[in-house]
Amino acid sequence: MYCERFICILRILGTTLFGVSLLLGITAAYIVGYQFIQTDNYYFSFGLYGAILASHLIIQSLFAYLEHRKMKRSLETPIKLNKTVALCIAAYQEDPDYLRKCLLSVKRLTYPGIKVVMVIDGNSEDDVYMMDIFTEIMGRDKSATYIWSNNFHDKGPGETEESHRESMQHVSQLVLSNKSVCIMQKWGGKREVMYTAFKALGEAWNYVQVCDSDTMLDPASSVEMVKVLEEDPMVGGVGGDVQILNKYDSWISFLSSVRYWMAFNIERACQSYFGCVQCISGPLGMYRNSLLHEFVEDWYNQEFMGSQCSFGDDRHLTNRVLSLGYATKYTARSKCLTETPIEYLRWLNQQTRWSKSYFREWLYNAMWFHKHHLWMTYEAVITGFFPFFLIATVIQLFYRGKIWNILLFLLTVQLVGLIKSSFASFLRGNIVMVFMSLYSVLYMSSLLPAKMFAIATINKAGWGTSGRKTIVVNFIGLIPVSIWFTILLGRVIFTIYKESKKPFSESKTTVLVIGTILYACYWVLLLTLYLVLITKCGRRKKEQHYDMVLDV
């Protein structure tokens, strides 16, 4: 007992020292600005800080590659399909077409005897259409439905404690005695919906799979996640490869699709190698039910800065598994398609909400670094503080640099993005990943200010993404982007005005002309390729079926 406590203290001290030393080292490298290579007039330079980031990308890609090799070997692993699995679907004002596709994909799941529980967040007449779709797809004679005037935490109007307790027991009994169940309940948010499913299922099931109502599951998705949990009893949760269903609907959904591939197949695959995936996504995840019931109450009642948390449910669910010392994994063998915003403003609000939960959960996650591999500490420091270093770099270049420094920065952003996207194209075997280099511009122009705004408003619970049946546009996300553009564009105009009064030397003029031409040609080429791809795939999309082939 004392020995275990002593080892725990040593691990806490060790990971804390490692994390602090890493942050101080990176900060020192950034401040000192030591350059390995630099040309006259600083037209090009490569320093220590850049080398650290480049090394991180190489190491991350290497471990992701090794994890994918392990996944391929697991194809031959025999599995007994004798464990019980329950699928929980969270629904809120869903687009009828997406909901139908979701439920049809659920019916095609190959795992035997899977129980399906769909909980609808809302019990008004406007929500009944989702229950009707459920009974239509799952079969009226094979499914049970219940319209609940309350939920597990809120009583209905005029309801007593005893009647509330009886209604909870009725919901639990309904779920346990039927293979397919749909429950409409009083609105309370996604966490309330998930809580209802978890509590109603009880501890009778081995594994619980989670899914959103806009998600289309691959038939083998459940089998592949069960396989990961069966291979190692110390794996508490596993997520799959989430791809974009509506990626050809707009430029924002298309760029999101290539970003998703990088996030899952490079970043999370690398985390999976060390058993510390930091977010099992809501569209496709599976947990050991025994673990869920150890922390479901604490998960539901999570508070931050004195307020109950109303977003970041999936990330906190993952963190709760990690807090118990269990590993979290990712498997590319389990796949799904899900909807993503096609409007810029809705996407921006979604990213701001996700950034809020990321920074909040970063603090919670830090308490459990000592229970996992050092990679968890290392990556948390690198990814957590990278936006701050990047903002400092941008402001420094725009306010202290010359016009060619600004141009060089723009070229460097695209060059780094092109190198990453080329490597991703090699790993995926699909040239479409080259468009990932365009996402870097979206990151610099929109995600950076959104992340800072997320930190400034981290305790505000409102304005997440709306339901898909009725899209609500919220303009508040434009505030940080507008401020960011004003700061940078104003300085660019001032720098051009100031330097135009002095004649450029021949070498500077040459650099500016060549750089501008290269930058313009790069954009013309990629935008042309994008238009060709969208025209070609847009025609195919009308006849496209999403039964089996997900990676298209």
Swiss-Prot record:
Record function comment: Catalyzes the addition of GlcNAc or GlcUA monosaccharides to the nascent hyaluronan polymer. Therefore, it is essential to hyaluronan synthesis a major component of most extracellular matrices that has a structural role in tissues architectures and regulates cell adhesion, migration and differentiation. This is one of three isoenzymes responsible for cellular hyaluronan synthesis and it is particularly responsible for the synthesis of high molecular mass hyaluronan.
Catalytic activity reported: [hyaluronan](n) + UDP-N-acetyl-alpha-D-glucosamine = N-acetyl-beta-D-glucosaminyl-(1->4)-[hyaluronan](n) + UDP + H(+); N-acetyl-beta-D-glucosaminyl-(1->4)-[hyaluronan](n) + UDP-alpha-D-glucuronate = [hyaluronan](n+1) + UDP + H(+)
Subunit structure: Homodimer; dimerization promotes enzymatic activity.
EC number of this enzyme: 2.4.1.212
Family (UniProt): Belongs to the NodC/HAS family.
Keywords, ordered alphabetically: Cell membrane, Endoplasmic reticulum, Glycosyltransferase, Golgi apparatus, Lysosome, Membrane, Transferase, Transmembrane, Transmembrane helix
Pathway entry: Glycan biosynthesis; hyaluronan biosynthesis
UniProt keyword annotation of Cell membrane present: yes
Compartments in which it is found: Cell membrane; Endoplasmic reticulum membrane; Vesicle; Golgi apparatus membrane
One of the record's GO molecular function terms: hyaluronan synthase activity
A GO biological-process term: atrioventricular canal development
Stretches that traverse the bilayer: 12-32, 46-66, 375-395, 403-423, 430-450, 476-496, 511-531
Any Pfam family matching the protein: Chitin_synth_2
Topology feature Cytoplasmic, residues: 1-11, 67-374, 424-429, 497-510
UniProt keyword Ribonucleoprotein, yes or no: no
Cofactor(s) named in the record: Mg(2+)
Record's protein name: Hyaluronan synthase 2
Chain's gene name: HAS2
Extracellular side: 33-45, 396-402, 451-475, 532-552
GO cellular component: endoplasmic reticulum membrane; extracellular vesicle; Golgi apparatus; Golgi membrane; lysosome; plasma membrane
Membrane topology of this protein: Multi-pass membrane protein
Main localization, broad class: membrane
UniProt xrefs under InterPro entries: Nucleotide-diphossugar_trans
